[in-house]
């Protein structure tokens, strides 16, 4: 199945861990980053296949900071970790920028925390920014903003962040590159009977029992965090591959359909997963009523909702809240994430996007609800 899932994937989140990026803490591994950059460029440019959108989630800031500060052991004091992250992020971003630029690609540094993705407005802002970067052909390089968080450094990991980014942009696949070849039924270093797991369902509860253990002194994630990340990614319909990051041409071979590493398959299609997520996790905050033309475009063509088609706004809501879209008879057509708060939406009713700046003092998205953030009701 890996052949079809990765071969058909058009939007891919790639996560690399500290032990790979830093060669077990001995500074950034320039050779490895050069190789990943070359492969990412081939994917983005469509060399030998379709063009793909790629997001890199990269650890390594703390490890690089430790090297620059002359520390051989990872400190336990939280503010020293934050200082190391601040120092190391400079080198990490510069390395990716240099290597991607050598391949003719632009890059963008994006620092996120779990809180950014838990807040609806910041979630929507982050999503819009990342999708714009992808549209421009830029490779976002994402890391956790370790300098301003605490729990994420102590207990978190970039495997989880990679999964959350896959959720955020509705990626087709998450590729976790690690220093292991994939998942085994037991630790192969201790159990000679351990068998390699080529494929499993991402939600299989037996996987966590197989993946016990902890991370290295450089990074914090072990195989268990990758299993949990795969389950999270599957929540938005993304399947996950866990593979050895130093496998030659690993990204190119995966996207050509070669079976490398462990494939953890999402059991729910992307559109259905998105609908279920909105139904289960987001509370309805308000509603807008639309005219006949807008209702038809939503129902029949799955178009975005433009303010010019809105005739009324109900309730008080903020940007990023879930609102219902109703026709003139009050029947619910769809639900989606609002790009504008209720007060702004009332000003924009029946107005073309060319008037937004005059009415609001700024001009952002032309849509009230973008089609990517909209789910039709009733199936």
From Swiss-Prot:
SUPFAM superfamilies: Carbamate kinase-like (SSF53633), PUA domain-like (SSF88697)
Domain PUA stretches: 285-363
Record's function text: Catalyzes the transfer of a phosphate group to glutamate to form L-glutamate 5-phosphate.
SMART domains: PUA
Compartments in which it is found: Cytoplasm
Domain of life: Bacteria
Protein name (database record): Glutamate 5-kinase
InterPro entries named in the record: AceGlu_kinase-like_sf, Asp/Glu/Uridylate_kinase, G5K_ProB, Glu/AcGlu_kinase, Glu_5kinase, Glu_5kinase/COase_Synthase, Glutamate_5-kinase_CS, PUA
Similarity comment: Belongs to the glutamate 5-kinase family.
Encoding gene (name): proB
Any GO MF annotation of the entry: glutamate 5-kinase activity
Pathway assignment: Amino-acid biosynthesis; L-proline biosynthesis; L-glutamate 5-semialdehyde from L-glutamate: step 1/2
Positions annotated to bind substrate: 59, 146, 158
Keyword line: Amino-acid biosynthesis, ATP-binding, Cytoplasm, Kinase, Nucleotide-binding, Proline biosynthesis, Transferase
Gene Ontology terms: biological process: L-proline biosynthetic process
Assigned GO CC terms: cytosol
Catalyzed chemical reaction(s): L-glutamate + ATP = L-glutamyl 5-phosphate + ADP
Enzyme Commission code(s) on record: 2.7.2.11
């Amino acid at each position: 199945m890996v052949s079809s899932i990765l071969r058909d994937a058009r939007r891919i989140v790639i996560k690399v861990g500290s032990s790979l990026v830093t060669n077990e803490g001995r500074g950034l591994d320039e050779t490895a980053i050069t190789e990943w950059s070359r492969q990412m460029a081939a994917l983005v440019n469509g060399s030998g296949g379709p063009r793909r959108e790629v997001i890199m989630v990269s650890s390594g800031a703390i490890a690089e900071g430790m090297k620059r500060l002359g520390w051989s052991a990872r400190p336990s004091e939280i503010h020293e970790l934050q200082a190391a992250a601040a120092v190391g992020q400079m080198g990490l971003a510069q390395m990716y920028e240099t290597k991607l630029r050598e391949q003719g690609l632009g890059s963008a540094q994006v620092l996120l925390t779990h809180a950014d993705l838990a807040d609806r407005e910041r979630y929507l802002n982050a999503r819009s920014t990342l999708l714009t970067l992808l549209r421009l052909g830029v490779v976002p390089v994402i890391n956790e903003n370790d300098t301003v968080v605490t729990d994420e450094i102590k207990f978190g990991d970039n495997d989880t962040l990679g999964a959350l980014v896959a959720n955020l942009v509705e990626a087709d696949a998450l590729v976790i590159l690690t220093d292991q070849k994939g998942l085994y039924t037991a630790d192969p270093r201790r159990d000679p009977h351990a068998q390699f797991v080529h494929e499993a369902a991402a939600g299989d509860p037996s996987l966590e029992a197989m993946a016990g253990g902890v991370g290295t002194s450089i990074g914090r994630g072990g195989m268990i965090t990758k299993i949990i990340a795969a389950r999270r990614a599957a929540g938005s319909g993304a399947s996950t591959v866990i593979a050895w990051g130093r496998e030659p041409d690993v990204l190119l071979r995966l996207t050509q359909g070669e079976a490398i590493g462990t494939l953890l398959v999402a059991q729910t299609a992307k559109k259905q997963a998105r609908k279920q997520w909105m139904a289960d996790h987001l509370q309805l905050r308000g509603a807008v009523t639309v005219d006949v033309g807008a209702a038809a475009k939503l129902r029949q063509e799955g178009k975005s909702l433009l303010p010019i088609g809105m005739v009324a706004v109900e309730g008080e809501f903020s940007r990023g809240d879930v609102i219902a879209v109703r026709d003139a008879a009050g029947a619910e057509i769809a639900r989606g994430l609002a790009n504008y708060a209720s007060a702004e939406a009332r000003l924009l009713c029946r107005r073309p996007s060319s008037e937004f700046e005059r009415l609001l003092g700024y001009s952002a998205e032309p849509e009230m609800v973008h089609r990517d953030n909209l789910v039709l009701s009733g199936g």
